[in-house]
Curated annotation (Swiss-Prot):
A motif (DEAD box) lies at residues 150-153. InterPro entries: DEAD/DEAH_box_helicase_dom (IPR011545), DEAD_box_RNA_helicases (IPR050547), DEAD_helicase_CshA (IPR030880), Helicase_ATP-bd (IPR014001), Helicase_C-like (IPR001650), P-loop_NTPase (IPR027417), RNA-helicase_DEAD-box_CS (IPR000629), RNA_helicase_DEAD_Q_motif (IPR014014). This is ATP-dependent RNA helicase CshA. It is a peripheral membrane protein. Residues 32-202 form the Helicase ATP-binding domain. Disruption phenotype: Loss of cellular aggregation. The gene is cshA.
Amino acid sequence: MKFSELGLSDSLLKAIKRSGYEEATPIQEQTIPMVLEGKDVIGQAQTGTGKTAAFGLPIIENVDTENPNIQAIIISPTRELAIQTQEELYRLGKDKHVRVQVVYGGADIRRQIKSLKQHPQILVGTPGRLRDHINRHTVKLDHIKTLVLDEADEMLNMGFLEDIESIIKETPDDRQTLLFSATMPPEIKRIGVQFMSDPETVRIKAKELTTDLVDQYYVRARDYEKFDIMTRLIDVQDPDLTIVFGRTKRRVDELSKGLIARGYNAAGIHGDLTQDKRSKIMWKFKNNELDILVATDVAARGLDISGVTHVYNYDIPSDPDSYVHRIGRTGRAGHHGVSLTFVTPNEMDYLHEIEKLTRVRMLPLKPPTAEEAFKGQVASAFNDIDELIAQDSTDRYEEAAEKLLETHNATDLVAALLNNMTKEAASEVPVKITPERPLPRRNKRNNRNGNRNNSHGGNHYRRKNFRRHQHGSHRNDNHGKSHSSRHSFNIRHRKEN
């Protein structure tokens, strides 16, 4: 359905077109008319489905720009999601001159107070910082028309339920309430009953919780094996942009440092980093100055970054819902993605729980060998050389090249170049990753699947467009492709219609 059929004004339709939206997504198509009518809505939708515009467009449409009071409040679980939401609403509401502000922890509260004096009509914030401003009387919610709880299940997981309830109680009883959540645990349903008035429900069917656009695999490995296997997979699959999920802050720090030590263009984010440092890392990742982002679940919540082709779950999540959130980082906007989950032998029951929720059976992958990883690096170097020759003018270097050829064998020269462009063998750069406490064993309700292991799997590797940080362009792959697979299903991105 086109946005022009949803009852939005011309100024908003222009903003929508400028933002690159073409047709409304299912969540937008169903939600926007309901919100415009003033109904309460519960939307079960994961990040990447367009839910920010689903609630943002009708909120902007309904804002009275002559009224200086806060008329809509959006509560987000993380700083990153709050910032992204504010930026998107600002872009969409710019033509209408709607003022949108964001408040979050880790930033100078005095600057936020100064910004709040500019009388925003839409306020986005994290629960703790919103509660702080309410206590300081720098935020007043008595004129709120619409309240949005975004990523409600994640706010619940982070322990924000009490803050959320106290914030809701500061708003008028006759407000409109919109609740969005990828999953619907009992506590979220209770919020709907307690604080919403005859809400309409927009629900994604369980089979759609993980999109068909994401090819889902697992590798069975012991904890001490995972890092070497992951780097080999990166060498062979050669992703464009990758997010690696670690269970703890220490894990994220060690993984990012280990990847950097092995020559990968990587950085890690978690809650202990300053907001300024997190913002700089995220800017680099969004602008293709980083190839690999390592993150905890909390730090990565709500990230809306286009072009992520691979998600590596270095640690399997203890909660199946977190898996849904993680792989929602890829397979967006009609593009295919790949998720790969590392599973230790005693974690197979967690894998079965994920499959039960998503109704998708993950395919096993056989870890690549060191030789296959080396061939992957060489193939990537071939691509880099092809691209350099095609794009750069080399005339000024021809004389120097001829002199080198007079004193050196051509094969030796090319071999030296390839040696410089590829990474050292893993054995030459040992990386120690501290073992994490293993997840407790679950009751073996899914024992019928307990014998799954990599002996049934094949090599599902993909060669595609790995951006070295010296230059971020795409290229076609014509060298060194590895296809050994016992499955007819291939990890390559399938042809898009």
